[in-house]
Amino acid sequence: NLWQFEMLIMKIALTSGFMFYSSYGCYCGWGGHGRPKDASDRCCFVHDCCYGKVTTCNPKFGVVVCGGDDPCKKQICECDRVAATCFRDNKYWFYGAKXCQEESDPC
């Protein structure tokens, strides 16, 4: 769920996802459209695409146990882990959620 994702970001990237990425660029936060503004925004784009491929459970709500046998929950954990690692590995610039009218990139 989103709270677990926040905790994972804090553990891996040593920063708050809610504070820094909840309205960053074209894809961090709710929804998403246009072209990612930078590498950090692309982390959110890839995360959105990853969640979009998870069809048998809802990745945003409910408790996810990453070590379990549920393949859907394992995929959610992997989506979140990849995004948190991506945030850690890319520079944060504050790009507000504006000028995102371009055609969206395909997943």
From Swiss-Prot:
Chief location of this protein within or outside the cell: secreted
UniProt-listed InterPro entries: PLipase_A2, PLipase_A2_Asp_AS, PLipase_A2_dom, PLipase_A2_dom_sf, PLipase_A2_His_AS
Catalysed reaction, written as an equation: a 1,2-diacyl-sn-glycero-3-phosphocholine + H2O = a 1-acyl-sn-glycero-3-phosphocholine + a fatty acid + H(+)
SMART domains tied to this protein: PA2c (SM00085)
GO-annotated molecular function: calcium ion binding; calcium-dependent phospholipase A2 activity; phospholipid binding; toxin activity
Keyword Hydrolase: yes
Pfam family for this entry, one: Phospholip_A2_1
pH sensitivity of activity: Optimum pH is 5.5-8.5.
Enzyme class name: hydrolase
GO CC annotation terms, alphabetical: extracellular region
Active site: H47, D80
Superkingdom in the source lineage: Eukaryota
One record GO biological process: lipid catabolic process
Stored Gene3D superfamilies: Phospholipase A2 domain
Signal peptide coordinates: none
Record text on cofactor binding: Binds 1 Ca(2+) ion.
Cofactor: Ca(2+)
EC number: 3.1.1.4
Disulphide bonds in the chain: C26-C100, C28-C44, C43-C86, C49-C107, C50-C79, C57-C72, C66-C77
Residues in coiled coil: none
Location(s), subcellular: Secreted
Subunit structure and binding partners: Monomer.
Biological role: Snake venom phospholipase A2 (PLA2) that induces significant edematogenic activity. Shows mild cytotoxicity on Trypanosoma cruzi and Leishmania infantum. Also inhibits ADP- and collagen-induced platelet aggregation. Does not show myotoxic activity.
Name of protein: Acidic phospholipase A2 braziliase-I
Organism for this UniProt entry: Bothrops brazili (Brazil's lancehead)
